[in-house]
A protein has these predicted regions:
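Residue-level detector of structured alpha->beta connecting loops
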Residues: 5, 120-121, 155
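Conserved glycine-rich beta-strand-loop-beta hairpin in the small C-terminal domain of fold type I
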Residues: 88, 104-113, 123-136, 146, ...
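Short beta-strand segments
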Residues: 9-12, 42, 126, 131-136, ...
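Conserved core segment of the aminotransferase class I/II
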Residues: 34-106, 110-114, 195
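Active-site pre-lysine segment of PLP-dependent enzymes
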Residues: 1-8, 14-50
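Residue-level recognition of strand-loop junctions within catalytic nucleotide-signaling folds
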Residues: 61-62, 92, 135-137, 177-179
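PLP-dependent enzyme catalytic core of the Aspartate aminotransferase-like
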Residues: 149-158, 164-198
Length: 198
């Protein structure tokens, strides 16, 4: 981006849920004059549990922020001023809450990974703060049909991989953040129950 004089836009809505022991996901802010080619997007809705108010942050060059502000003043999803002022005062007091949530989500992700690690039919190809992308081994069955069978017979709601693009037929996206530890521990047995219906 520096060579081509372009902006790299990174959406770090989930940055507070990156596993603490993994360290920073990148070192882009250590590059001299990073703000000339980097735009970081962030949302308070996930970390601080403040959904619906469209509150977030943009970190970049001051001149560019000035231009972005002009656009935001003229669109409907612009964050309302009272909510902006309220959140600004509370942010310093939310650090412990955010850390607790981060640890809770890490525990859930680790349990989910451990639960599926022994499965021969299912493989976690990527896992993040809220979702896991899981590969199934039923090559002769469409993933949307797999998703229907899981919902109807196993009590698992998933999103077929084809919703995310081509060549995703063998994948399902599963949400794990909203589950209890007990529910996560039961996912493997529910997936295995699918064998009865295939």
């Amino acid at each position: 981006c520096i060579k081509k004089n372009k902006y790299l836009i990174i959406d770090e809505t989930y940055r507070d849920f990156i596993y603490p022991d993994k360290g920073a996901p990148h070192n882009l802010f250590s590059i001299p004059n990073w703000s000339k080619n980097l735009i970081q997007l962030y949302s308070f809705s996930k970390s601080c549990c403040i959904p619906g108010h469209r509150l977030g942050a943009i970190t970049t060059d001051k001149g560019l922020i000035s231009q972005i502000s002009k656009i935001m003043d003229n669109i409907q999803i612009c964050a309302p001023r009272p909510a902006q002022h309220s959140v600004a005062k509370f942010l310093p007091h939310l650090e412990n809450f955010v850390n607790e949530k981060s640890n809770e989500i890490e525990t859930k992700a680790n349990l989910f990974s451990k639960s599926l690690s022994a499965s021969s039919k299912w493989e976690i190809t990527s896992i993040g703060s809220f979702f896991a992308y899981v590969k199934h081994s039923y090559n002769n069955i469409k993933c949307d049909d797999i998703a229907k069978l899981l919902a109807k017979n196993c009590g698992l709601i998933t999103i077929p991989g084809i919703y995310f693009g081509k060549k995703q037929e063998n994948f399902l996206r599963m949400s794990i953040a909203g589950l209890s530890l007990k529910e996560i521990a039961n996912v493997k047995s529910r997936l295995e129950k699918l064998e009865k219906y295939i």
